[in-house]
């Protein structure tokens, strides 16, 4: 379970991990990739297809199918399927060994979708669930999964601070001064003035949240 800021490439990492696993696997495993909306589903499928298309010709496994948000190897029968949370079916007609649940905090009907997709998972040596999302406030499925992951030694939980990423910085005007609350946050979390102003703009700026 990963808790992350936006646009650090974590969804791509999850996609790459599942593609690498499926590429090396000789069993006909199926991986379900579930995104929060149609645009994200399209993006994840394009990323998956790019991994295959970018391989040297000598390393490319032959494809049986590469359409309808599905990628299937002809030789091993390995399949990746990309679906949108809340869409028709939720993959219930299939059995999967692996699940990449992306941006879970923004899934519509999150608990219902989660119950549906996890019921398709086959218990066995290939089973793995990879959950990644930007937080969306307390409560809901993703908050529950994070709290469970933090308490469960059998689950790998990773928290990625936005302040650890160089893109989240903005130079303030010369006359800008942080509020006392912002100064306290800077002291508590070790933020510099560029990070603090970036945060300020994201909350109070014209293009912020």
What are these regions (language model features)?
Residues 1-209:
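Phosphate/NTP-binding elements of NTP-utilizing enzymes
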């Amino acid at each position: 379970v990963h808790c992350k800021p936006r646009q650090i490439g974590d969804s791509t990492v999850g996609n790459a991990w599942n593609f690498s696993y499926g590429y090396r696997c000789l069993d006909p495993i199926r991986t379900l990739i579930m995104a929060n909306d149609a645009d994200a589903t399209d993006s994840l499928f394009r990323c998956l297809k790019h991994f295959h298309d970018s391989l040297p010709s000598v390393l490319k496994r032959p494809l049986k199918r590469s359409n309808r948000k599905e990628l299937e190897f002809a030789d091993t029968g390995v399949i990746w399927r990309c679906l949108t949370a809340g869409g028709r079916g939720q993959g219930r007609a299939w059995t999967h060994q692996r699940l990449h649940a992306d941006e879970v905090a923004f899934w519509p009907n999150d608990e219902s979708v989660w119950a549906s997709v996890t019921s398709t998972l086959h218990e066995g040596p290939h089973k793995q669930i990879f959950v990644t999302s930007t937080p969306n406030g307390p409560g809901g499925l993703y908050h529950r999964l994070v709290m469970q992951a933090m308490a469960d030694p059998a689950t790998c939980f990773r928290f990625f601070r936005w302040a650890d990423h160089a893109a989240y910085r903005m130079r303030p005007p010369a006359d800008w001064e942080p509020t006392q609350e912002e100064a306290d946050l800077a002291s508590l979390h070790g933020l510099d003035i560029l990070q603090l102003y970036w945060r300020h703009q994201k909350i109070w700026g014209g293009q912020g949240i």
